[in-house]
Amino acid sequence: MHRGSLSRGHTSAVLAAVVAALAALAALLVATTPAQAAGSGALRGAGSNRCLDVLGGSQDDGALLQLYDCWGGTNQQWTSTDTGRLTVYGDKCLDVPGHATAPGTRVQIWSCSGGANQQWRVNSDGTVVGVESGLCLEAAGAGTANGTAVQLWTCNGGGNQKWTGLTGTPPTDGTCALPSTYRWSSTGVLAQPKSGWVALKDFTTVTHNGRHLVYGSTSSGSSYGSMVFSPFTNWSDMASAGQNAMNQAAVAPTLFYFAPKNIWVLAYQWGSWPFIYRTSSDPTDPNGWSAPQPLFTGSISGSDTGPIDQTLIADGQNMYLFFAGDNGKIYRASMPIGNFPGNFGSSYTTIMSDTKANLFEGVQVYKVQGQNQYLMIVEAMGANGRYFRSFTASSLSGSWTPQAASEGNPFAGKANSGATWTNDISHGDLVRDNPDQTMTVDPCNLQFLYQGKSPNAGGDYNSLPWRPGVLTLRR
C-alpha cells in the first residue's frame, strides 16, 4: 500500500464420469449439446425431491421460480454454463431482481445480460450460490410442497439449500490447474467505512470457525489505522458487520494461523522496525494481540518507501518473507520454520526486477492446492488503473515465471474483473479455507478480496475512498 501521491492503482466438454452419474438419476435428462455447458438437466432439491421449476411454464422476463414435481418439462431443464450462468429455454437466465443482496429475495428468470446478478456458483456440496450476494438458492421456509417459493438466503447447510443434477465447480478428482487467462465476476462495494474513516483498504482474510475474518487498514485522510470486521458468514453480510478499530495500528496486515506453534500471527508495517509481528490465541479480538516484535530489520536502496507490503508463507522446511519497495523489485528472506515466529534479520535476496510500474507493491504468495506450484501476484500500475500480474514457481526458493502478466491479460484488472464500480483492482488477498502458514488456495474456487474506488475519485492518495469488493473466478 503506497502512502504517496500516486493513484493505487466452454467451451468445455461434460466430464464423462459426471455424465454417467447423472444418467443414473431417473429424473435427470442430460442435454444433447454438452459442448456448450458445464452441465445440463433438472435441478432437484435434496430436501424435497422436487425440481426447480419456472412457474406455469412461462418464458416471460420476471417469471418466478418454485418447487414442483419433476416431470421433464423444458421449464425444468437448466444449463450451467462456463460463464457462471444458469439458463433455461436457451436464452433466459436465473436472475436476482434489481441486483438485490438481501436474504428472502425471490429469484426469477430474465433475458441473459451477463450481469453479476445472473452469476452462480454450482458447488460440489450441492449448494448454488449467487456470486453477487454470496447467498444460497433455497426452498423458502424449508418447504417441500409443490409451489414452494425459491429464494436467496444465508447459507446454512440445510437440505433445502442442496440441489442435485448439475456438475459442481471442482472436477471429479477435486483438483484444477490455474487458468492461463483469468475471467472474473465482481461484487459491488461490500462495505462503507464507519464515521471518521474515508477508506477501508489493504485487506487480509482467513476462514475462522466457518466465517470470514477480515483485517485491514483505515485512513482518516491524514493518518492510517487498522481494524477488523466482526466475523461474518457471507460476503453480503460484510456491510452490516461491525468495524472494530485496533488500539495499536497494524497497517497492511497479513493474518494466518501458525500451526506448528498453535498460535495466530499478525504481521504488518510502519512501526519500530520495517516489518513487525504480534501473536494471539484469539484472532477475532482486535486488541488481544501480544506486544510488537521485529519481523524484519533490513533496508533497501532506490525506494522512497523502504520495505513495504510484506507477506509470509511456509513450506515444510522454511518460513519465507516476501515484500516490495514501490521500486520495481520484489524481495525475499527466509528462516528455518522452527525459528518462527521470529526476526528474519536484515538480509534478503532480490528475486525480481522490472520497471516501477510493473512491480509496484501488494505482493502475495500462495500454494496452489493439488499442484506442485506456487502463485505470486504483484500489484502494478497501468494506463487503466491498478491491476495484478501473476507469476508461478515450483518452489518458494526458486525463480518465478510470468503467467498472466500484462495489463491486457492480467491476473486481475479492469480488462477482466467484471467490476463496474471501479477500474482499479488493488491491494487484497485470495480467500483461503485453510488459514495456516501454507497459504493454500483452491484453484477450482478462486475468490479475491480486493480494494477498489470510484473511477471519478482523485486527489491525495491518503484521501482516496477505497472500498472492499470480491472477485470470483469464472471457469
From Swiss-Prot:
Lineage: Bacteria, Bacillati, Actinomycetota, Actinomycetes, Kitasatosporales
EC number: 3.2.1.55
Stated role: Involved in the degradation of xylan and is a key enzyme in the complete degradation of the plant cell wall. It has a specific arabinofuranose-debranching activity on xylan from gramineae. Acts synergistically with the xylanases and binds specifically to xylan. From small arabinoxylo-oligosides (ranging from arabinoxylotriose to arabinoxylohexaose), it liberates arabinose and, after prolonged incubation, the purified enzyme exhibits some xylanolytic activity as well.
Metabolic or biological pathway: Glycan degradation; xylan degradation
Principal place of residence: secreted
InterPro entries: GH62_arabinosidase, Glyco_hydro_beta-prop_sf, Ricin_B-like_lectins, Ricin_B_lectin
Substrates-to-products reaction catalysed: Hydrolysis of terminal non-reducing alpha-L-arabinofuranoside residues in alpha-L-arabinosides
Any one of the GO CC terms: extracellular region
Pfam families recorded: Glyco_hydro_62, Ricin_B_lectin
Name of this chain's protein: Extracellular exo-alpha-L-arabinofuranosidase
The protein's enzyme class: hydrolase
